Amino acid sequence: MTTLAGAVPRMMRPGPGQNYPRSGFPLEVSTPLGQGRVNQLGGVFINGRPLPNHIRHKIVEMAHHGIRPCVISRQLRVSHGCVSKILCRYQETGSIRPGAIGGSKPKQVTTPDVEKKIEEYKRENPGMFSWEIRDKLLKDAVCDRNTVPSVSSISRILRSKFGKGEEEEADLERKEAEESEKKAKHSIDGILSERASAPQSDEGSDIDSEPDLPLKRKQRRSRTTFTAEQLEELERAFERTHYPDIYTREELAQRAKLTEARVQVWFSNRRARWRKQAGANQLMAFNHLIPGGFPPTAMPTLPTYQLSETSYQPTSIPQAVSDPSSTVHRPQPLPPSTVHQSTIPSNPDSSSAYCLPSTRHGFSSYTDSFVPPSGPSNPMNPTIGNGLSPQVMGLLTNHGGVPHQPQTDYALSPLTGGLEPTTTVSASCSQRLDHMKSLDSLPTSQSYCPPTYSTTGYSMDPVTGYQYGQYGQSKPWTF
């Protein structure tokens, strides 16, 4: 901007495209002060070096004419944080000079000439305060702003030269503190008094010269209330684009009779609300995909039944178990009236319990838990591969060399405790299921799926499986 008018300038349509650096790393350029870099706005900066003084003057001048810091940042190609910091410091202290990079401020040592002048002022006017003496030193050009002693230093000199009582000293210190707070350095009176008393030699320096431009104090703005017509216009524009450019915002501001800044803030808030609503909708859609109830990790199970150590001899099999290696199996969910311990009547040599002992022609004993029909309803049950021994798996794959068995297929009847033909099992199950239909919906049930003996050899034939609950059997299922 070459000239600054009182009104905020309108943005012009851009001319030919400018090639700004698009890479993620800033470009390095050579400057008289050293190696500089290019920021995201295209401006050159040097790390560790303050912003040049003429740019600081320009920032204050543009802010004095009512231009917003974001516009100043774009036009001067200075970062927004730098612009805000310079303006904030100028409002507080009236100075645009950069702060100290590091270290502490050197202690001011009062010269003898300054001490004599302080004593002279005090003799001429005994009621003069320390801050008044300090202002008079600046006004008479005895000191400049860099060498003038502080209020506390002047008070210390006065106490040493003019001895007073402790009460008078305390009263003087209290009054001086109150007056110094009223006319602090960053106050309007302090800035004006320092500027008026500044020596003429300092005005020629570019660093020490301060712009004499009062800035408007930032006041809290009342919340904007939009009318229905304005909201309708803004919503229509938001449906077209969520990120309108400066020209679209200005046109929309003219139609809605708002400022471009209010339109920009409204779009920012509207985008935030839209993102929040979109996230909530995605979460609801995801919840609809999830089934209503996942089974918990530990489902409530029915009380487990343990078989007593006493083995009951089945009435249908006259031969007792004589193999010491035979084991009594204790399934967890079965009622205590069933004991799976029997022998094969057609093979008296083996005297092995069906599916329980480990002999050369029989299956190895199952583990103490059965396989659930589906899913992890009971996490304590292993898979069926854990219940079969390697000898059984070898028998299933090798059908040769196995002695011939009778023609009848036998299946274990858990309710009678012995071996029965499959027809009798079905009959007995149908009789017991007449009064147990209400138990089909029990949550935890397990199936006992025993293998059968076939005519050609040992194999796993699909037979009817039974699910056992707490009180009886449920509907049969097959593999």
Curated annotation (Swiss-Prot):
<dbReference type="GO" id="GO:0005654">
    <property type="term" value="C:nucleoplasm"/>
</dbReference>
<dbReference type="GO" id="GO:0045893">
    <property type="term" value="P:positive regulation of DNA-templated transcription"/>
</dbReference>
<keyword id="KW-0225">Disease variant</keyword>
<feature type="DNA-binding region" description="Homeobox">
    <location>
        <begin position="219"/>
        <end position="278"/>
    </location>
</feature>
<dbReference type="InterPro" id="IPR017970">
    <property type="entry name" value="Homeobox_CS"/>
</dbReference>
<comment type="function">
    <text>Transcription factor that may regulate cell proliferation, migration and apoptosis. Involved in neural development and myogenesis. Transcriptional activator of MITF, acting synergistically with SOX10.</text>
</comment>
<feature type="region of interest" description="Disordered">
    <location>
        <begin position="165"/>
        <end position="228"/>
    </location>
</feature>
<feature type="modified residue" description="Phosphoserine">
    <location>
        <position position="205"/>
    </location>
</feature>
<dbReference type="InterPro" id="IPR001356">
    <property type="entry name" value="HD"/>
</dbReference>
<keyword id="KW-0539">Nucleus</keyword>
<feature type="site" description="Breakpoint for translocation to form PAX3-NCOA1 oncogene">
    <location>
        <begin position="319"/>
        <end position="320"/>
    </location>
</feature>
<dbReference type="Pfam" id="PF00292">
    <property type="entry name" value="PAX"/>
</dbReference>
<dbReference type="GO" id="GO:0007399">
    <property type="term" value="P:nervous system development"/>
</dbReference>
<keyword id="KW-0217">Developmental protein</keyword>
<keyword id="KW-0597">Phosphoprotein</keyword>
<dbReference type="GO" id="GO:0006915">
    <property type="term" value="P:apoptotic process"/>
</dbReference>
<dbReference type="InterPro" id="IPR001523">
    <property type="entry name" value="Paired_dom"/>
</dbReference>
<feature type="compositionally biased region" description="Basic and acidic residues">
    <location>
        <begin position="172"/>
        <end position="188"/>
    </location>
</feature>
<keyword id="KW-0656">Proto-oncogene</keyword>
<feature type="DNA-binding region" description="Paired">
    <location>
        <begin position="34"/>
        <end position="161"/>
    </location>
</feature>
<protein>
    <recommendedName>
        <fullName>Paired box protein Pax-3</fullName>
    </recommendedName>
</protein>
<keyword id="KW-0524">Neurogenesis</keyword>
<dbReference type="GO" id="GO:0000785">
    <property type="term" value="C:chromatin"/>
</dbReference>
<dbReference type="InterPro" id="IPR009057">
    <property type="entry name" value="Homeodomain-like_sf"/>
</dbReference>
<dbReference type="GO" id="GO:0009887">
    <property type="term" value="P:animal organ morphogenesis"/>
</dbReference>
<dbReference type="GO" id="GO:0045944">
    <property type="term" value="P:positive regulation of transcription by RNA polymerase II"/>
</dbReference>
<dbReference type="GO" id="GO:0003700">
    <property type="term" value="F:DNA-binding transcription factor activity"/>
</dbReference>
<feature type="modified residue" description="Phosphoserine">
    <location>
        <position position="201"/>
    </location>
</feature>
<keyword id="KW-0897">Waardenburg syndrome</keyword>
<keyword id="KW-0805">Transcription regulation</keyword>
<keyword id="KW-0563">Paired box</keyword>
<feature type="region of interest" description="RED subdomain">
    <location>
        <begin position="113"/>
        <end position="161"/>
    </location>
</feature>
<feature type="compositionally biased region" description="Polar residues">
    <location>
        <begin position="338"/>
        <end position="351"/>
    </location>
</feature>
<feature type="region of interest" description="PAI subdomain">
    <location>
        <begin position="37"/>
        <end position="93"/>
    </location>
</feature>
<dbReference type="InterPro" id="IPR043182">
    <property type="entry name" value="PAIRED_DNA-bd_dom"/>
</dbReference>
<dbReference type="InterPro" id="IPR022106">
    <property type="entry name" value="Pax7_C"/>
</dbReference>
<dbReference type="Pfam" id="PF12360">
    <property type="entry name" value="Pax7"/>
</dbReference>
<keyword id="KW-0238">DNA-binding</keyword>
<dbReference type="InterPro" id="IPR036388">
    <property type="entry name" value="WH-like_DNA-bd_sf"/>
</dbReference>
<dbReference type="GO" id="GO:0000978">
    <property type="term" value="F:RNA polymerase II cis-regulatory region sequence-specific DNA binding"/>
</dbReference>
<keyword id="KW-0517">Myogenesis</keyword>
<dbReference type="GO" id="GO:1990837">
    <property type="term" value="F:sequence-specific double-stranded DNA binding"/>
</dbReference>
